[in-house]
Amino acid sequence: VQYERQRLLRTPIAVCIARAQAVARAAPDGYTLLVCSSAFVVNPSLYVNANYDPIKDFTPIARTGDLPFMLVIHPDIPANSVAELIALAKKEPGKYSYASGSSSAIVSGATFARLAGIDLLHVPMMFIDVPTGLPHVNAKALKALAVTTKKPSALLPHLPTMDATVKGFDITSWQGYFGPANMPKDVVTRLNAEIREVIERPDINSQLAELGMEAFSGTPEEFDAFVKDQ
């Protein structure tokens, strides 16, 4: 099967919100789709101008990949595991801070502090996505302690999960396809099948892995349940 190449644009938050709104208003015929990340779900809670409901205004079609995060610390911090880091933070409440470069990193740090029962200062700018953090870990500028996904990452099988120490911790960034609300089931099913066929190709899997993303293949129903759980 030959697929026509399409150009995808990475856009600022404001433009992403505008495009989500445009897709929500489009005809549910399968010709206008939104490719987005997990920020799509949280944006309405962060930006008053979002004006869309990620559940009611869209039809989930396919979840295509997960982007795991790592818990990383400065090499000088005397901790080599999540448990040791928690012990340090409990011993000296308020001493340790965590930085973030995205909404997912903010949520990761806040969830860690809540579940572990420790006091951490948030410094907006610890949790970082794999492709951004891995070069620094390999250069020994950062120390990686764990991945944030509930299951071990296929990209970093040597790293333990946060959940192994902090039960209930499961955070990942993801990407997927959505259409307007009320799309016909047969159209959703066909689009899902076409997308999955591409995602499951070995060459596409390899390209996603190079970007630090784990390919994901599932049904529209599974994606719908996943989005509602977010």
Please annotate each region the language model reported:
Residues 1, 17-22, 45:
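Active-site pre-lysine segment of PLP-dependent enzymes
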Residues 6-14, 59-60, 98-100, 120-128, ...:
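Short beta-strand-to-loop elements that line the ligand-binding cleft
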Residues 11-19, 67, 80, 103-104, ...:
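Short helix-initiation/N-cap motifs at beta->coil->alpha
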Residues 25-30, 45-123, 162, 167, ...:
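Hinge/capping helix and adjacent helix->loop/strand transition within the periplasmic-binding protein
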Residues 30-36, 99, 124-128, 143-146:
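Paired acidic/hydrophobic, glycine-rich loop segments that form the ligand-binding mouth/hinge
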Residues 39-49, 106, 110-115, 127-158:
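A ligand-binding cleft/hinge motif common to bilobed small-molecule-binding domains
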Residues 133, 152, 162, 204-205, ...:
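A generic structural signal for short hydrophobic patches within well-formed alpha-helices
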Residues 219-230:
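Extracellular/periplasmic bilobal clamshell ligand-binding domains
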